[in-house]
């Protein structure tokens, strides 16, 4: 496992563990759930070689970063401020965001909240979700008697008890279940609302080619304090929607690129935002579906992701555009 330079950056009232490599324009790589900065292990070297400074945090609640206990510490305003604080600490006025999953949700909001700081956004798996109603993802009545993990995560202590019981097994099953190697959309297969997160999911044996025991060693280290911090992001969904209500009619006008796997469960859970991605990000330079890929594009399909990312970045150099924010 390659060792990278690590900085502990104090910003926004917390300390964040950030891998920092290279020099040049700043790329800020934001992971989602249940990951850590280690998600981007296949991207860092290629981006540094292309002439960029790369900053890869364990976001708050994750890995080697601080993990506030309060749910209120994980709203979108604070998560967005963390990203800007990293850029400030590294001396960059502007930066480009490279994001995945929850990192994409944060990245889209950073682009809206700090339009003059964000040059561009390259997002994987999750499109702009601006305008999602309060409760849309967190209230059981919206889903009948069907289990939905975003609702399950609202119950204090319940998900932690399940997932913390065997962290390695939990991660192994979660990573596999939303990948392109698992039965198509099996993660979204109907099960009763009384179910647990891992019920019905497959524990892979052997591991898929893109996930090694060494990788799991690192992830287990990153989750040594359990799942509470990461799950608190979900418990703050409605709080974040309320705090960013003023953004509901805004559009992301920075150059952007979106990519999703054809077998990613987000195709089901976020069908409406996916249908509106070009409307919500009118300066979209690419809207790509990787056939046969699942949710973990940076590790399932690193070559395709890196090629698309480097091509997008090269296009920014040849045709720079100023960032702005508009309503419509």
Predicted regions and their residues:
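Flexible "cap/lid" subdomain of the alpha/beta-hydrolase fold that forms the substrate-access gate
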Residues: 2-4, 26, 62-98, 102-285
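Short acidic-hydrophobic surface loop/beta-edge motif
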Residues: 5-11
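A short loop-to-beta-strand scaffold at the N-terminal edge of the catalytic core in hydrolase folds
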Residues: 11-20
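Conserved HGGG/HGGXW glycine-rich cap/lid loop of the alpha/beta-hydrolase fold
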Residues: 19-66
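Signature tryptophan residues that serve as conserved aromatic anchors
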Residues: 33, 37-40, 102, 108, ...
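Active-site loop/turn elements of alpha/beta-hydrolase fold enzymes
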Residues: 59, 126, 292
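Catalytic active-site module of serine/aspartate enzymes centered on a nucleophile-bearing elbow/loop
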Residues: 283-328
């Amino acid at each position: 496992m390659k060792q990278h330079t690590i900085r502990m950056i104090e910003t926004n009232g917390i300390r964040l563990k950030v891998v920092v490599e290279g020099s040049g324009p700043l790329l800020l790589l934001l992971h989602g759930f249940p990951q850590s900065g280690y998600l981007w292990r296949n991207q860092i070297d290629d981006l540094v070689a292309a002439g960029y400074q790369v900053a890869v945090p364990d976001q708050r609640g994750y890995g080697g970063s601080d993990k506030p206990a309060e749910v209120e510490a994980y709203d979108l305003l604070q998560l967005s401020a963390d990203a800007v604080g990293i850029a400030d600490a590294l001396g960059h006025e502007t930066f480009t965001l490279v994001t995945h999953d929850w990192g994409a949700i944060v990245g889209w909001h950073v682009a809206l909240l700090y339009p003059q700081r964000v040059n561009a956004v390259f997002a994987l798996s999750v499109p702009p979700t601006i305008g999602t109603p309060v409760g849309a993802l967190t209230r059981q009545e919206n889903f009948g008697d069907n289990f939905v993990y975003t609702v399950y995560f609202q119950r204090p202590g319940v998900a932690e008890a399940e997932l913390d019981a065997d962290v390695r097994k939990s991660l192994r099953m979660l990573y596999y279940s939303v990948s392109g190697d698992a039965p198509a959309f099996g993660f979204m297969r109907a099960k009763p609302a009384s179910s647990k997160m891992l019920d019905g999911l497959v524990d892979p044996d052997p591991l898929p080619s893109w996930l090694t025991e060494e990788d799991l060693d690192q992830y287990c280290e990153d989750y040594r304090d359990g799942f509470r911090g990461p799950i608190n992001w979900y418990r703050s969904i409605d709080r974040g929607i309320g705090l960013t209500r003023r953004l509901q009619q805004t559009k992301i006008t920075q150059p952007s690129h979106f990519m999703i796997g054809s077998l990613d469960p987000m195709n089901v859970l976020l069908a409406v935002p996916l249908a509106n991605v070009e409307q919500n990000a009118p300066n979209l330079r690419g809207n790509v579906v990787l056939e046969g890929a699942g949710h973990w594009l940076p590790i399932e399909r690193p070559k395709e992701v890196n090629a698309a990312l480097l091509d997008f970045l090269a296009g920014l150099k040849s045709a720079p555009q100023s960032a702005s924010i508009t309503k419509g």
